[in-house]
Every structure is written in structure tokens, then in C-alpha cells.
From Swiss-Prot:
This is Uncharacterized protein y4xG. The chain crosses the membrane at residues 11-27. GO terms for cellular component: membrane. It comes from the Bacteria. One of its GO terms (molecular function) is monooxygenase activity. InterPro entries: FAD/NAD-bd_sf, Flavin-dep_Halogenase_NPB, Flavin_halogenase, Trp_halogen. Keywords: Membrane, Plasmid, Transmembrane, Transmembrane helix. It comes from Sinorhizobium fredii (strain NBRC 101917 / NGR234).
Length: 505
């Protein structure tokens, strides 16, 4: 049955926070000015998940909602995020680090594509060269550039980088709330105890204790409370517990220690630790498996790592997975009310912003009249997107580390079928667009592209040098000559492409 919102009088949003206020601002633009948009600022717990690292679709989300970037930077204490630094994931000791940079335009290695792959990148892989050093802006990291220096290089358009930001959740929320109120959004502080449904299963009203607030369309941004899908509609939960190993986290702050435009992700004995540098502090946390450590053990390991005491601000249970259906009739859940994954790669933020973009797109393009098939398409694409997130995050744990029980058991664990199939392909060639196509559809965009997969799979050895050599041998003679010239410039050697053995040094 279609959803007809042409006569809607009120849009109700449960939960403030970043997700609730972003949804309110987006829907305020979609609906006519005489339609009331109300945010019920019920207490929420991490509606966008822990961690302060932005995703690549953050800036698009800000621009689409006409949010001033400079004001956001000031009020959210935002700092540039140009990629992720991974330490100790390969178990090779020091220095064991690699980067996933946010590569943009103007990079020959990324812009040169032949037959579905990137031959110049494959040449670097075959030659054993780092991938991140092909990005001109990587110098910003090596020289520990200031925010001003980063701004200056990005303004030239020659950095080869696409920026995002680390941000303070509370500051970002305050900014969104101020903008939302200025744009006529109504705010109420109340606790939502339940929802009244009509005989079609549509939400008619929020139950606020002694009163009801009637609504025509409802958004759940209540965070881990999950008032809609979890308590009213009893939607099936699709768990990632057998794929993604962490189920607990401690969250803490560190003193700032110089400029760093990357999120740091450090592999630990029973999980991994993140550091997101902000203006006045470093937001940090340790996501770990309760099978191998408890909170006290995690804090002790963190303190041993840094050499000073650390105070945990929060201890969280991480139930990773998603609800099989996010949009039910006139109700949709966003953020952690819809699903959750650990803060690795800021994947939850990326998914939330993409889900909101598609909700807005469907409502706007349909002029408030939404066919059932569009809702089905949204739910199907949402599920595919979550599966892509799961598989991309699982790639990060596909390590050769076996130095602790956590890593030994991971190395022996069964892989999900989809990722296992991709992994088999990556043993023979580099990741390609056809590999990630199954994760998108119905207007949704991919959260992680081929370059992202390559940037993680190659350093971990999931894509071996021999795989890059093999696909280079399949190039035409002309293309191979161009690649050979690139390699000669790259290494200043007489490395050759052999028709039988790949690269020779």
C-alpha cells in the first residue's frame, strides 16, 4: 500500500542528538512550511555511535542541508580527517603501519583505469611500493601539518585528497539544534513511552506519559533505546556477532599531542583502539571482545600502552548488526536505532548519512506520495548496504596476527560466504567495482569504493603481489609498455614485466 503524506500535519522525530536534528533539518526542507516538524528530545545514547571520526559523505550531508562549514568547524571543534592510520594490525612489530587515505581527483594512479582495474596501482602493488605515497597530500601527515597548512593545500586543488572532519558530538548537536530551531522546527523535552498504531499498522501518535502527540510520519533517532523497530514493530535483528568480534568498548579522552589529520586505529590484544584528534582533546576508545578481556583488563592494557593512567568515561555493550526492515509504513529508524557497528572506518556515520539522503530523496521525488515498492527498495538497499559494511570491516581483521588468543581464534574463524567469495577473487586480482555492486542499489551509493578495499586488502596481504602481477600480464602490449614506463619512473630501476613471472627486480 502506498504512503500518502500530502495532507500531513506533523512529522515527529524521537530523540535529538546529531541524527534526530539532522533528520529534522532535512525533512523541514522536504515538507511544506505549514507542516510541523517536532523533535522529542528524549534522552539518547550514542545515536551516531561512539567515536568522533567523520565519514566521506559528511561534507555532502552538511552542504545538502545548507549548513555553514566554517560555523560547523568552530562549534563542533572539528579538525581535518584525511584518512586512517592503522598500527599493529599485521603483527609485524614496529613499524607496522599502513594508511587508507581519502584519495580524490588528480591522481594518475586512481584515474587510470583499464578493463575494470587500476594498472598503475597494480604496478605499485607488484613492485611492493606503498599505495598511500602516490597521493600528493600525504606530505601533510609526514610533516604534521597544522590545520591552516591543510586548508591552504586543499584550496589549491592539488592535494589529491577529499577531506572529512573529526568532530565533537556535543558541539555538533548544539549547532544542529540551534539551526533547527531557527528554521522553525519545534522542540519538546519528553520521554516517549510508546506509540499508538492504527488498524493499518501506521504510527498515529507518540505516547508521552500523560498525553499523546499525533503524528503523520515518524522517525526514530532514539539511539540504543530503539523504541520503534525493537519495541513496537518487533522487527527481526540480523546480528553480526559471528563475523565482527568486538562486543564491548571503553571510551576515554586523551590530552592533545600535536596536529594529526588522520584517525589512528591501533590493534590491541583483544580488539582495537581508536584516537580521533579534536581541537582541545583526543577522543579515544578501545573496542574489545568480552571473550578475551573485561573492562578492567582493557583499561590496564590501554594504560600500559600509553604509560599513564586513563579514566573510562563510558563502558558500552556493542551489539553489532541491523534490523532487517528500517522503514515500516509511516515509520523509519535512523542511526543506532536502525543498526550498529563498531566505530571502525566511521561506518555507522557513513551509513546514517546515506540512509537519511535516500529517505529525503524518496519523499521529495515522490512529492510525499511513496509507492510500497519504493519502501521495499529502500529496505532492500539498506540491508545490502549493511552487508557491505560488515564485509568491509571483516576485511580489517583478516590479518596474519596470531600472537594472542583473540587473533589466533580470528585467524581460524569461518568467514561469511560473501566475503569469503570476494577474498578468493582477491587472491587472483585486485578489488573491482563489480565486487561492491551487490552492496548497493535502489539509488543508494557505495560507502566504500574499490580504492578503499584495495587500501586495506593489499597491506594485509589479502591481495598478494602475485595477484597484481597476474592482472598486469593480461594487459595489451601498449598498456604494458605504459605501465613499465611508470614503474621505471617510480623506482628508477630496470624492473621488467615478464610474461611468465610478473615483475622482476
Amino acid at each position: 500500500m502506498m504512503l500518502d503524506l500530502t495532507n500531513a500535519k506533523r512529522i515527529g522525530i524521537i530523540g535529538g542528538g546529531i541524527v534526530g536534528w539532522l533528520a529534522a533539518i532535512a525533512l523541514r526542507r522536504v515538507f511544506d512550511v505549514d507542516v510541523d516538524v517536532t523533535v522529542i528530545e528524549a534522552p539518547t545514547v550514542f545515536p551516531l555511535g561512539p567515536g568522533e571520526g567523520g565519514s566521506l559523505n559528511l561534507i555532502d550531508t552538511l552542504c545538502r542541508n545548507e549548513l555553514d562549514l566554517d560555523v560547523f568547524i568552530g562549534e563542533a571543534g572539528a579538525t581535518h580527517k584525511l584518512g586512517v592510520l592503522y598500527e599493529n594490525w599485521r603483527g609485524g612489530g614496529i613499524p607496522d603501519r599502513y594508511y587508507r587515505m581519502f584519495g580524490g581527483s588528480g591522481i594518475p594512479e586512481i584515474e587510470c583505469r583499464v578493463g575494470g582495474f587500476f594498472p598503475l596501482l597494480s604496478a605499485r602493488i607488484a613492485a611492493g611500493e606503498n599505495l598511500h605515497t602516490c597521493i600528493p597530500g600525504f606530505e601533510l601527515i609526514t610533516k604534521k601539518a597544522s590545520q591552516v597548512e591543510i586548508d591552504e593545500l586543499l584550496a589549491t586543488g592539488e592535494s589529491g585528497l577529499y577531506p572529512s572532519f573529526h568532530f565533537n558530538h556535543a558541539g555538533f548537536e548544539r549547532y544542529l539544534r540551534r539551526v533547527g530551531l531557527a528554521r522553525g522546527i519545534t522542540s519538546r523535552r519528553a520521554v516517549v513511552h510508546g506509540m499508538r498504531l492504527d488498524d493499518r499498522g501506521h504510527v498515529n501518535a507518540f505516547q508521552l506519559g500523560g498525553e499523546e502527540l499525533e503524528v503523520d510520519f515518524a522517525v526514530d533517532a532514539s539511539g540504543f533505546a530503539r523504541l520503534g523497530l525493537g519495541k513496537v514493530f518487533n522487527t527481526r535483528w540480523c546480528s553480526f556477532a559471528n563475523v565482527l568480534p568486538t562486543d564491548r568498548a571503553i571510551i576515554f579522552e586523551l590530552e592533545p599531542r600535536g596536529s594529526s589529520p588522520v584517525t589512528r586505529a591501533t590493534a590491541m590484544k583483544a580488539g582495537w583502539m581508536w584516537e580521533a584528534p579534536l581541537n582541545r582533546s583526543i577522543s579515544a576508545g578501545y573496542a574489545f571482545s568480552s571473550r578475551y578481556a573485561d573492562a578492567a583488563m582493557a583499561i590496564a592494557e590501554v594504560e600500559n600502552h600509553y604509560g599513564f593512567r586513563v579514566e573510562a568515561k563510558h563502558e558500552l555493550s556493542l551489539d553489532q548488526g541491523y534490523f532487517s526492515t528500517a522503514w515500516v509504513n509511516n515509520f523509519v529508524a535512523l542511526g543506532t536505532a536502525s543498526g550498529f557497528v563498531e566505530p571502525l572506518e566511521a561506518a555507522l556515520a557513513a551509513h546514517t548519512f546515506e540512509a537519511l539522503r535516500n529517505l529525503e530523496r524518496i519523499l521529495a521525488n515522490g512529492s510525499g506520495i511513496v509507492p510500497a515498492r519504493a519502501i521495499e527498495g529502500y529496505n532492500s538497499a539498506n540491508a545490502r548496504c549493511w552487508t557491505g559494511v560488515r564485509d568491509f570491516l571483516r576485511l580489517h581483521y583478516d590479518s596474519k596476527r596470531i600472537d594472542t588468543p583473540f587473533w589466533r581464534d580470528l585467524a581460524a574463524a569461518e568467514l561469511p560466504e560473501g566475503y569469503a567469495n570476494l577474498r578468493a577473487c582477491f587472491q587472483k586480482r585486485t578489488p573491482r567495482f563489480i565486487d561492491i555492486q551487490p552492496y548497493v542499489g535502489s539509488g543508494w551509493q557505495s560507502l566504500f569504493h574499490e580504492i578503499d578495499w584495495i587500501s586495506v586488502a593489499v597491506p594485509l596481504g589479502v591481495v598478494p603481489q602475485a595477484a597484481a602481477c597476474a592482472e598486469l600480464r593480461r594487459l595489451s602490449t601498449e598498456s604494458r609498455s605504459e605501465v613499465q614506463a611508470y614503474v621505471d619512473r617510480l623506482k628508477g630501476t630496470i624492473a621488467k614485466i615478464s610474461s611468465t613471472r610478473g615483475y622482476m627486480h
